[in-house]
Amino acid sequence: MSATNNIAQARKLVEQLRIEAGIERIKVSKASSELMSYCEQHARNDPLLVGVPASENPFKDKKPCIIL
């Protein structure tokens, strides 16, 4: 039973390694430049950079607190 378990685990490992070997890889310098370019192109749509208009902000209180 143990031998068949080991064989099954080895086959799974080999299959996983084949999948990982088939992944296309690129250099970090190219990936980082592409990421920076993407961020620059989409910066105007990023709510963390440009903010959310008060009229569209679902978390802004509609009316002030009466207690204060």
Swiss-Prot record:
What family is this?
Belongs to the G protein gamma family.
Grouped into one coarse class, the protein's main location is membrane
Cellular compartment(s): Cell membrane
Q: Any keyword Membrane?
A: yes
Modification sites for Blocked amino end (Ser): S2
* PTM note: Ser-2 is probably acetylated.
Q: What does this protein do?
A: Guanine nucleotide-binding proteins (G proteins) are involved as a modulator or transducer in various transmembrane signaling systems. The beta and gamma chains are required for the GTPase activity, for replacement of GDP by GTP, and for G protein-effector interaction. Plays a role in the regulation of adenylyl cyclase signaling in certain regions of the brain. Plays a role in the formation or stabilization of a G protein heterotrimer (G(olf) subunit alpha-beta-gamma-7) that is required for adenylyl cyclase activity in the striatum.
Instruction: Tell me how this protein sits in the membrane.
Output: Lipid-anchor
* Name the UniProt record assigns to this protein: Guanine nucleotide-binding protein G(I)/G(S)/G(O) subunit gamma-7
Its quaternary organisation is: G proteins are composed of 3 units, alpha, beta and gamma.
Modified positions (Cysteine methyl ester) in chain numbering: C65
